[in-house]
């Protein structure tokens, strides 16, 4: 706050008279009134005028915001793909892969009521509608190790006898082989246990007929299984007959299961 004072001016008196008059006046007159004062409040500091953003800066901010949103969305997309690939597909693959076994009475053996055990690895492809089975070397004999494909799209079954390293193809027998969905449900129901309930075994006999040169016509699944291997077509015998020892030497057996029972596939006339 600034204080400004004004002193009153004296006019019309000259010389000594003026001095005496002023002295007497000052002696007789009452005390002088205080000088007039004006109080001034200091002016507020002026603020700089509002600075408007330039047009170029506004556009740049929008661009940075857009780029940030794009990066965020891309991160969400990649995270979703990662979760889908490494968690969902992995879980789906585990649900479609089975390592299982079955206990059965071997009625085909010369020894009566022989209890046997068969293990196999099963992969079921529901969307492609085919099954792939791997039969390892049996612990107690009774068959050859093999890879088997049941292609329900083509209506074909392929056996890869690992001991002979040869492929054999025949029409799919739907009375024995469960479709992928049904087989998957069966294995899921018994997944809590290691083995299926004790069951029995049946036998089917097949005969080699001709060599297959065009493997691509068999479909991509069987082609990849039999590529680079001698491949032959099979014909199923309509009537069962007892096989003597001489004929048995020319037959190879593969034991497997795609149902609630075990199947022994005899492939005779092996080249």
Curated annotation (Swiss-Prot):
Q: Give disulfide pairs as residue numbers.
A: 167-226
List the Gene Ontology MF annotations in alphabetical order: amyloid-beta binding
Tell me the leader sequence span. Answer: none
Keyword terms of this UniProt record: Cell membrane, Cleavage on pair of basic residues, Disulfide bond, Glycoprotein, Lysosome, Membrane, Phosphoprotein, Signal-anchor, Transmembrane, Transmembrane helix
PROSITE patterns attached to this UniProt entry: BRICHOS
Post-translational modification (record): Type I membrane-bound, as well as soluble, furin has a pre-eminent role in ITM2C proteolytic processing. PCSK7 and PCSK5 may also be involved although to a lesser extent. The soluble form of PCSK7 is incapable of processing ITM2C. Fails to undergo shedding by ADAM10 and intramembrane cleavage by SPPL2B.
Cell compartments where the protein resides: Lysosome membrane; Cell membrane
SMART domains reported in the protein's UniProt record: BRICHOS
Phosphothreonine: residues bearing it: 41
Question: What superkingdom heads the lineage?
Answer: Eukaryota
- Stored Pfam families: BRICHOS
The answer on whether this UniProt entry bears the keyword Ion transport reads no
Look up the record and report any one GO term of the cellular component aspect: lysosome
What family does this belong to?
A: Belongs to the ITM2 family.
Please report the name of this protein according to its UniProt entry: Integral membrane protein 2C
Species assigned in the record: Bos taurus
Q: Tell me what gene encodes this.
A: ITM2C
